[in-house]
């Protein structure tokens, strides 16, 4: 059984993509349980280094950021900031709407949108969305009393280390959690002007991340089995396979970071 932390088969219907959280065709939605497992294991690897403070989570291939928004709701106390980037402007627009749902103003705006759709069309799905939105609003109002999660998005090619370094401006990244492009619904968009490399796009992303991470950063990546997630500058902390996908947790070799 691959799940060690998200072992409970709970009902995540209130968090379904397209109900309250925004979704669009062509933007895959990482399963809530899988995202939770990836994050929880990353936290465990941090705890093994005696690191327990709320962390900054970064996704260099954030897409619509559905998984980042649900992580915020379900792991609020463990997250200080969420940063996402993508090369696709449409993805970033969708991501902004989803991350706005981590704010009272954003959830109120979404409730108003759903109410308008319900009044206009009266579909059962709209009634379900209204009920779920009220659940999320109540949950969020309790969470923001604890602290707020800072969210930021920017446009960048995940394989361009210089661009990532410029945009992140030296801010520490504690956990990188990403679902890299694969399959028929999404794909890598490596610019034609990118330097030639023998690495795969996923390998180039890992190479680029070396410019913005520290030896304590935990990288959690999910990809299809055809994409290798090995890189000589990283050591593997853990791995599991789930259907046609595999998930790995990595950390940079300390000597690599020291020599950057």
Where are these regions (language model features)?
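Class I S-adenosyl-L-methionine-dependent methyltransferase catalytic core
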Residues: 1-260
């Amino acid at each position: 059984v691959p799940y060690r932390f998200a072992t409970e088969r709970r009902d995540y219907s209130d968090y379904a993509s397209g109900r309250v959280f925004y979704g669009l065709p062509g933007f895959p939605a990482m399963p809530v349980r899988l995202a939770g497992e990836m994050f929880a294991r990353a936290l465990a690897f941090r705890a093994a280094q005696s690191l327990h403070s709320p962390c900054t989570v970064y996704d260099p291939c954030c897409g619509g950021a559905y998984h980042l928004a649900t992580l915020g709701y379900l792991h609020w106390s463990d997250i200080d900031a969420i940063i996402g980037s993508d090369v696709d402007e449409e993805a970033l627009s969708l991501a902004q709407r989803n991350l706005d749902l981590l704010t009272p103003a954003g959830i109120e705006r979404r409730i108003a949108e759903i109410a308008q759709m319900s009044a206009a069309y009266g579909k059962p799905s709209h009634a379900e969305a209204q009920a779920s939105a009220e659940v999320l609003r109540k949950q969020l109002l309790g969470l923001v009393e604890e602290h707020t999660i800072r969210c930021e998005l920017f446009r960048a090619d995940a394989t361009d280390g210089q661009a990532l370094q410029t945009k992140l401006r030296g801010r520490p990244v504690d956990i990188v959690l990403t679902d890299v492009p694969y399959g028929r619904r999404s794909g890598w968009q490596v610019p034609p002007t990118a330097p030639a490399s023998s690495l795969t796009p996923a390998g180039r992303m890992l190479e680029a991340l070396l410019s913005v991470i520290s030896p304590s950063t935990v990288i959690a990546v999910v990809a299809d089995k055809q994409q290798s997630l090995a890189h000589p500058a990283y050591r593997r902390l853990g791995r599991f396979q789930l259907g046609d996908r595999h998930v790995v947790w990595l950390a940079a070799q300390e000597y690599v970071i020291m020599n950057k």
